[in-house]
A protein has these predicted regions:
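Active-site SXXK
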Residues: 26-55, 86, 219
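Mid-domain, small-residue-enriched loop/turn segments at the edges of structured enzyme/sensor domains
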Residues: 78, 96-155
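Short, well-structured active-site flanking segments
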Residues: 42-61, 109, 160-163
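Short, small-residue-biased leader/transition segments that mark boundaries at the very start
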Residues: 1-7
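Acidic helix-start/capping segments at beta-turn-to-alpha-helix junctions
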Residues: 12, 51-68, 102-103, 170
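Structured C-terminal helix/loop/strand segments within mature extracytoplasmic catalytic/sensor domains
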Residues: 4, 17, 100-101, 105-106, ...
């Protein structure tokens, strides 16, 4: 199966502006890290967590692709630094450490359920959650559900204004999604995004973007089951982005 799915929502009204296969399940891959940091910020807002709390960890905690956490084995990292690493650099150990603070994958799923998302689910940790087995519902979402959830996190009342701004700031500082939507972005456009990559040709991105420096729409794109190389998958998403912008 080769599949791509997409959903675009107006970030103010929530109205679906364009969609393709919006209610099919695809693996979330690292795009879940935005939802995870949203859950962490929710705990901060409730007084159950502190962004400045330092978390110490060991070599045994490190998993594949941990470019930031591997440099801080001696001094540890704060919750704020871990969220930044998870979103801006897609650091997998940072994500696992943050998952531990909220109680694991099931608690992230429960958080999403409580905010009205009965579709998106996280079942495993990094890096196993990127396995992307066909017809496996573990660690998946649907683009319409993800678009709605992302909109609620970034513009709704679920998080405080400060936490909403913090989440979008981390996404705006994303350093690993350059070849995707960002490569098609005209000067002056705003983008805050998070990409994901997995096995079996899986690739994805969730983003808030728009002209005049303002995020006016939520864009969610996932693809899986492709034989394409990573460069080809990146180019495919960039081309979708260019088309979206052309017909904005």
């Amino acid at each position: 199966l080769v599949g791509s799915e997409m959903c675009i929502r107006d970030s103010n009204s929530g109205k679906i502006l364009e969609s393709f296969r919006p209610e099919e399940r695809f693996p979330m891959m690292s795009t879940f890290k935005v939802l995870l940091c949203g859950a962490v910020l929710s705990r901060v807002d409730a007084g159950q967590e502190q962004l400045g709390r330092r978390i110490h960890y060991s070599q045994n905690d490190l998993v594949e692709y941990s470019p930031v956490t591997e440099k801080h084995l001696t001094d540890g990292m704060t919750v704020r630094e871990l969220c930044s690493a998870a979103i801006t650099m897609s650091d997998n150990t940072a994500a696992n450490l943050l998952l531990t603070t909220i109680g694991g994958p099931k608690e992230l799923t429960a958080f999403l359920h409580n905010m009205g998302d009965h579709v998106t689910r996280l079942d495993r940790w990094e890096p196993e959650l990127n396995e992307a087995i066909p017809n496996d519902e573990r660690d998946t979402t649907m683009p319409a559900a993800m678009a709605t959830t992302l909109r609620k996190l970034l513009t709704g009342e679920l998080l405080t204004l400060a936490s909403r701004q913090q989440l979008i700031d981390w996404m705006e500082a994303d350093k690993v999604a350059g070849p995707l939507l960002r490569s098609a972005l005209p000067a002056g456009w705003f983008i805050a995004d998070k990409s994901g990559a997995g096995e079996r040709g899986s690739r994805g991105i969730i983003a808030a973007l728009g002209p005049d420096g303002k995020p006016s729409r939520i864009v969610v794109i996932y693809t899986t089951g492709s034989q394409a190389t990573m460069d080809e998958r990146n180019r495919q998403i960039a081309e979708i982005g260019a088309s979206l912008i052309k017909h904005w």
